[in-house]
Structures are given as C-alpha cells and as structure tokens.
Amino acid sequence: MTKLLDEAFGEGEMPFDIEPADIDETPLEFETPLAHVQRLAQGKAHVVAQRYTDLDVIVIAADTTVDVDGEIYGKPENLDDARRMLGEMSGRTHRVHTAISVVRGDRQAHTVDSASVTMVQISPELMDWYLGIGESLDKAGAYALQGDGGKLVETVQGSFTTVVGLPLEPLSDLLAQCGLSWKFGA
C-alpha cells in the first residue's frame, strides 16, 4: 500500500504517515458486505482523526472486502482459510468493495467503489504455489491483484485501484469535498 500511496501522492510532493486504527473488524450479524466495509473505513478515519483535533490534518481511511454471493471475505485466518476462500472463488466472479473515508476537521466525505473480479480456474498446483509464496494471509479474499495473485485473475471490471484497496478517482473527489484539490497522476 505504501508504494501505491507514494505513486498517488507524487513521491513526496504531499507527505503522509500511515497510522494503525485499532478497531474491531468482526462483521456484525446480518451486516452486508457494503455496510461492513463502510463501517470499517469510517471507524478507522474517526479513530485516527481524534488524535489530531488541534491540527489541520487530512485523514484518509480505506477498507476493502471481497463479496462472494453476499458473504464477507476479509483476510484469511490461516492457510486453510485462504485455501477455502480461493477454492470457492475459483472460476467464478466476485465483487470487491473498497470504502474510503476522508476527515479534515469538521468536514467528512465517504464513498464506496466496487469492481467485479473473475478468477481463473485454480488448479491444485497453482493453489499450492500461490499459498506457498506467503502473499495470501494479509489480503482480503486471500489474493493480491497487484502481486503474484494477479496470476489467479482472469478479468477485472472496474478500477484496478479499487481491487488493490485505494480507488484513486473517488479519493480525489472526496479530497475536493474536504477542501483539497488533488488529481492523482497529474
């Protein structure tokens, strides 16, 4: 994510820090994937913004979840869970939702961007190889499109940056709503 942020914010043109926001990410009973990801992004932004009430700081929080037939796939608990997730998505299309919350003083702006991802039919050999490289455990849905997990993906309909966790065009709109004009890649 740091590499994406460096590219997005011009390799130092806009300095940033990454701060953890320790919130409970357990889905609530009957919570939809969209509601879940929105709640987490807004909760993370609120927690971090509370640390800077006296400063003119822009807080950007994002959270990504994989939606497989309405079931929330967050980060896998272990390799068996990653194998289960990838096996269930193999040869199928799922949705990836990334929610972004921006807070600047008393201004707040929030959105969710979604993309559809179709996975290849994952052979046992491909599954074993991918799980063996160690990339799956810290990614929603157990794969990283921007890494070797891209080999598991057949097509993406929507924004690549949504799937990797920070949709840049919607983020630019949210920053403008909070008083900062910033165009990514400009």
What are these regions, as identified by a protein language model?
Residues M1-E19, Q177, S181:
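N-terminal G-site helix/loop of the GST-like fold
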Residues E11-F30, Q108-S114:
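Short glycine-rich, Thr/Ser-proximal phosphate-binding strand/loop in the N-terminal lobe
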